[in-house]
Amino acid sequence: MARTIALWAGPRNGSTALMYSFAQRPDTRVLDEPLFAHFLRHTGVARPSRDEVLSAMSSSKPDALATLVPAPSDEVLFLKHMANHIEGLDWKDLDGPKHRHVILTRHPDGVLPSFRAHIDHPTLLDLGYVHQHRILKLAGERAAVITAESLFANPTGTLRALCDALDLPWQTEMLTWQKGGILEDGVWAKYWYDGVHNSTGWEARTLQHGNTPPHLSELRDQCLEHYLALEQHALKT
């Protein structure tokens, strides 16, 4: 039976680059946000790619959940999710005996300025910190937490630690990829993936924090409470 690794990320966390890392592994098949259409239909939220996503993917709950089932040929199935895509779904349908969960989170002072370039008025629902905290409580010891700050500052060390936590052999191929994109990219890639498409792999760097506008300070503080709780469980590298 195939193993499933479910990544639960927030926006602007580096989740696409992490998906690209796992896509380089010969033992792994990746899926890009298979629950996105269901999330859009269930919540009604606006996204730049909303119409394209709903045209390209089924938004029904049964169809969305069916995509999460490993194929007979799969050894490892890596599911890249946004954490808020659990909206309207039962945890029992997103977990199983062969599941491991990865929570990728980032300080809100790094997320909010970047996310506002795409979504003018972000909400707690958009940013996913509450969902990540909930997932950690539900998954317990089968969840590994990593921060975007650690992943970008020390990609080799963080990816090695993550592989160890997931009981996967380390593969150096995870550090590089071809410039351009991968076949598994969702139809929303043109709106969000420019940085990854113009890269050829991980380069250690420090993620910068921006200035959160005063009118978002309350939202920032709400997110920070959950981020700090998640950070306490982050893998050491």
Language-model segment annotations:
Residues 79-173, 187, 193-196:
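PAPS-dependent sulfotransferase catalytic domain
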Residues 37-38, 151, 177-178:
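Positions that flank functional sites
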Residues 56-64, 133-136, 197-205:
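Short, basic, helix/turn surface patches
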Residues 1-73:
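PAPS-dependent sulfotransferase catalytic core
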Residues 1-5, 171-237:
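PAPS-dependent sulfotransferases, especially Golgi type II membrane carbohydrate sulfotransferases
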Residues 38-40, 111, 180:
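Generic structural signal for helix capping and beta-alpha/helix-loop junctions
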